[in-house]
Curated annotation (Swiss-Prot):
Catalytic activity: S-ubiquitinyl-[E2 ubiquitin-conjugating enzyme]-L-cysteine + [acceptor protein]-L-lysine = [E2 ubiquitin-conjugating enzyme]-L-cysteine + N(6)-ubiquitinyl-[acceptor protein]-L-lysine
Record-given protein name: E3 ubiquitin ligase Rnf157
Enzyme superclass (EC): transferase
Motif (D-box 1): 329-332
Keyword annotations: Cytoplasm, Lipoprotein, Metal-binding, Myristate, Transferase, Ubl conjugation pathway, Zinc, Zinc-finger
Annotated domain remarks: The D-box motifs play a key role in RNF157 stabilization.
Gene Ontology molecular function: any one: ubiquitin protein ligase activity
Superkingdom of the organism of origin: Eukaryota
C-alpha cells in the first residue's frame, strides 16, 4: 500500500481493470495486504500479513469490488489523524418488518389466501437534512466516489422521503409495502457471487455541495419463519465520506442496557453495564482490543497486558493491536448541577495533569466513551432513603443520593433521643427481618399470642432494674459527627458494578473512589429474602441484653409492672422479645415476633453497629486485631464503615482502597495506538 508521504504528491493512477477482475477475498493470486500499515500517523509492520485488523477477512468483500481513487486527502501535518464526521446513523437493531393493518387481496384470488404485506421501519439519527430511499434486490455501483444502488426492477424501490436534522427519528412509510413471498428463496439472502443485496436502506445527506456524496448505507436480508411470516436481519453498515467507502464494525461493550425496553433486567446484567475496566475495576475503559473489538480495558491495564499476555480477557482470543478511543467535551462550570460526574471524576483529574502530553485542548476534558455515546449513565430507579415506612417496617436498603454530589443533612441526636430512637428502630428492624428469616419456619399459634405478650412484659420489667453503668448518656462530640463510608463487611472487589449517579468519598481518603462505589453499589441493591436468610443471627436493638443486662426503651418503661399488670411465671423456653405499645396489625392484635433460632454458637456471636442497631450476623471482618467475636454494646449512632475503637473490642482499622496499578510504558512487544476517533455533535475531537 505504500507510505503516506509517497502518495501526497503522486497523481491518480489510471488503472484499466476489466469487469471480470475484481477485488475479492481470498484473492485468486497474490496478497491482499501489504507488509505494513499506517495508523495514527505512524508506520507499523504487519505481524500477520493476511489478517484483517478490524474483523473477519470475509468482511472485506463488503467494501466494493473496485479500488478507489488515490491519493487520499492527507491530514494537516500537525494533526496526524483526520477525524471523519458521521452525519447519519441508522440504528440497525431497530430495523423491523411490520404487518400492514389490512391484508391486500389481488383480483381473482381466493379469500382464504390473502397475501401479507409489510412496512419497513427503523430509527435513525442525523445532524443534517437527509433523503432516505429503500431498494430491494439491488446491486451497488461506485461512480466518482458516489455510491448508487440499482434494483433489478424499478418497482422494487420506495419513494424518497426527506427528513430534517434530529435524533431518534422514526422512518415509517405506510404507502410503501413489500411482500417477500413473491421472491425466490435464494433471493431472500445475500450471495457473494450474485452481488445482489435483498434490502438496501440508502440515506444521503441533502445539504449542498459541502457534503456531496456523504451517505449511510444499511444492508439487510430476509428470513422466513416456519409459520410463513418474514423478518428482516441487518447485514452490514457502510459510510461513504469524501468518496471513500468505510465499513462500520460493531464495538462490543459500549451499548447502554438501561435504555432497553425490558425494564426487568437481572442484577447480573445490570452489573455488566459498568464503565470500569474489567481488570482493575477502577479506571474508565477506553482501549479497544483488535481484531475482536472488545472495549474492556483502560489505558494503564492495556499497557500492562501487552507485556504479560496476548489474549483478550473477554474472549481469550489473541489480539494484534490495542486502540485507545477518547471522547472530549467542554468543561462544565462550577455552578453547573452536573459538573460533578461520578464515573469520570478521577479520570478528569488525571487528564488535567497530563493535558499537555496527551494533546487535550484547554477547556476540554476526557469523558467516558459510554457516556459520550449513550448520554449520562443512570443507575436503577431511585432507591428510597433509609426510613421507617408507614406500616412500621424498616426499609432494608441504603439511601440513594442525587447527582448533585453532596450528602443529605444529618440530624444530630441528643443522647436520650438517640437511645430511644435506636431502641424503637431496632425493634422494628428485627420484626421485619425476622419475618423474612423465618418464612420457612413454624408460625406461632394463635393461642400462644396472649401468653407470649405477658411473658415479654415480664422480661422487660425485670430488665428495667438492671442497667450497665458504662452505657450512660455521655457522648463525645466526635461521636456525633456521622460519616458515610464503605462498610467493612462488604467485599470491595465485588462492589464495582453499576454505573452510579454520584459518588461520595470518605473525608479521610478523598481519592478512594472504590470505597465510594462500594457504598453506592450497596445503595442500589435491596436486601432480598435469600440475603437475609443467610444471616445466622437477627437484628436486635442496642438496648437489648448483654450478659443478662439491658437498656430498656422509654416506651417499654411505661409498661412496668407498677401499672397493675399481672406478672406470670416465666417459662424456661420463652424466647420472645417485647414490642413497644402501638405495634399492632390491621386487626388491632399485638404482633409478637419470634427470635431466630438458627444453630449458632453462643460464644461465637458478635454485634456490629449498623445505624444504631446491633447485628448478630457473624460476618468476618477484615480486622487484624480480632481476638474474639464478642464486643460490647455501643450506644453511638454509627453508619457502615465507622467503628468507635474506644467502645469496641475490635481493632479499628479502616479498609483502604486498593492501589492502582502502575502505569506501564510503551514497548515494542505489541503495537499500541492512541487515536481520537469519536466525533459527536457539539463535541471536540
Amino acid at each position: 500500500m505504500g507510505a503516506l508521504t509517497s502518495r501526497q504528491h503522486a497523481g491518480v493512477e489510471e488503472v484499466d481493470i476489466p469487469s471480470n477482475s475484481v477485488y475479492r477475498y481470498p484473492p485468486k493470486s497474490g496478497s491482499y495486504f501489504a507488509s505494513h500499515f499506517i495508523m495514527g500517523g505512524e508506520k507499523f509492520d504487519s505481524t500477520h500479513p493476511e489478517g484483517y485488523l478490524f474483523g473477519e477477512n470475509s468482511d472485506l468483500n463488503f467494501l466494493g469490488n473496485r479500488p478507489v481513487a488515490f491519493p487520499y486527502a492527507a491530514p494537516p501535518p500537525q494533526e496526524p489523524v483526520k477525524t471523519l464526521r458521521s452525519l447519519i446513523n441508522i440504528r440497525k437493531d431497530t430495523l423491523r418488518l411490520v404487518k400492514c393493518a389490512e391484508e391486500v387481496k389481488s383480483h381473482g384470488e381466493e379469500a382464504g389466501k390473502a397475501k401479507v404485506h409489510y412496512n419497513v421501519e427503523f430509527t435513525f439519527d442525523t445532524d443534517a437534512r437527509v433523503a432516505i430511499t429503500i431498494y430491494y434486490q439491488a446491486t451497488e455501483e461506485f461512480q466518482n466516489g458516489i455510491a448508487s444502488y440499482i434494483p433489478k426492477d424499478n418497482s422494487l424501490q420506495s419513494e424518497t422521503v426527506h427528513y430534517k436534522r434530529g435524533v431518534f427519528q422514526q422512518f415509517c412509510l405506510p404507502s410503501h409495502t413489500v411482500d417477500p413471498s413473491e421472491w425466490a428463496e435464494e433471493e431472500l439472502g445475500f450471495d457473494l457471487d450474485r452481488e445482489v443485496y435483498p434490502l438496501v436502506v440508502h440515506a444521503v445527506v441533502d445539504e449542498g455541495d459541502e457534503y456531496f456524496g456523504h451517505c449511510h448505507v444499511l444492508l439487510g436480508t430476509f428470513e422466513k419463519h416456519p409459520d410463513g411470516t418474514f423478518c428482516v436481519k441487518p447485514l452490514k453498515q457502510k459510510q461513504v465520506v469524501d468518496g471513500v467507502s468505510y465499513l462500520l464494525q460493531e464495538i462490543y461493550g459500549i451499548e447502554n442496557k438501561y435504555n432497553t425496553q425490558d425494564s426487568k433486567v437481572a442484577e447480573d446484567d445490570v452489573s455488566d453495564n459498568s464503565a470500569e475496566c474489567v481488570v482493575c475495576l477502577s479506571d474508565v475503559r477506553d482501549t479497544l482490543i483488535l481484531p475482536c473489538r472488545h472495549l474492556c480495558l483502560c489505558n494503564t491495564c492495556a499497557d500492562t497486558l501487552r507485556y504479560q499476555a496476548n489474549n483478550c480477557p473477554i474472549c481469550r482470543l489473541p489480539f494484534r493491536a490495542l486502540l485507545q478511543i477518547r471522547a472530549m467535551r467542554k468543561k462544565l462550570g462550577p455552578l453547573s448541577p452536573s459538573s460533578f460526574n461520578p464515573i469520570i471524576s478521577s479520570q478528569t483529574s488525571d487528564s488535567e495533569e497530563h493535558s499537555s502530553s496527551e494533546n487535550i485542548p484547554p477547556g476540554y476534558e476526557v469523558v467516558s466513551l459510554l457516556e459520550a455515546l449513550n448520554g449520562p449513565l443512570t443507575s436503577s430507579p431511585a432507591v428510597p432513603p433509609l426510613h421507617v415506612l408507614g406500616d412500621g417496617h424498616l426499609s432494608g436498603m441504603l439511601p440513594s443520593y442525587g447527582s448533585d454530589g453532596y450528602l443529605p443533612p444529618v440530624r444530630t441526636l441528643s443522647p436520650l433521643d438517640r437511645l430511644s430512637d435506636c431502641n424503637n428502630q431496632g425493634l422494628k428492624l428485627k420484626k421485619s427481618l425476622s419475618k423474612s428469616i423465618s418464612q420457612n419456619s413454624s408460625v406461632l399459634h394463635e393461642e400462644e399470642d396472649e401468653r407470649s405478650c405477658s411473658e415479654s412484659d415480664t422480661q422487660l420489667s425485670q430488665r428495667l432494674s438492671v442497667q450497665h453503668p458504662e452505657e450512660g448518656p455521655d457522648v463525645t462530640p466526635e461521636s456525633e459527627n456521622l460519616t458515610l463510608s464503605s462498610s467493612g463487611a462488604v467485599d470491595q472487589s465485588s462492589c464495582t458494578g453499576t454505573p452510579l449517579s454520584s459518588t461520595i468519598s470518605s473525608p479521610e481518603d478523598p481519592a478512594s473512589s472504590s470505597l465510594a462505589q462500594s457504598v453506592m453499589s450497596m445503595a442500589s441493591s435491596q436486601i432480598s429474602t435469600d440475603t437475609v436468610s443467610s444471616m445466622s443471627g437477627s437484628y436486635i436493638a442496642p438496648g437489648t441484653e448483654e450478659e443478662g443486662e439491658a437498656l430498656p426503651s422509654p416506651r417499654a418503661a411505661s409498661r412496668a409492672p407498677s401499672e397493675g399488670e399481672e406478672t406470670p411465671a416465666e417459662s424456661p423456653d420463652s424466647n420472645f422479645a417485647g414490642l413497644p405499645a402501638g405495634e399492632q396489625d390491621a386487626e388491632g392484635n399485638d404482633i409478637i415476633e419470634e427470635e431466630d433460632r438458627s444453630p449458632v454458637r453462643e460464644d461465637g456471636q458478635r454485634t456490629c453497629a449498623f445505624l444504631g442497631m446491633e447485628c448478630d450476623n457473624n460476618n468476618d471482618f477484615d480486622v487484624a486485631s480480632v481476638k474474639a467475636l464478642d464486643n460490647k454494646l455501643c450506644s453511638e449512632v454509627c453508619l457502615p464503615g465507622e467503628w468507635q475503637c474506644a467502645e469496641h473490642e475490635l481493632g479499628g482499622r479502616r479498609p483502604s482502597a486498593r492501589p492502582r496499578s502502575p502505569r506501564g510504558g510503551l514497548g515494542k512487544e505489541a503495537s499500541a495506538f492512541r487515536i481520537e476517533t469519536v466525533a459527536l455533535p457539539g463535541t471536540y475531537v
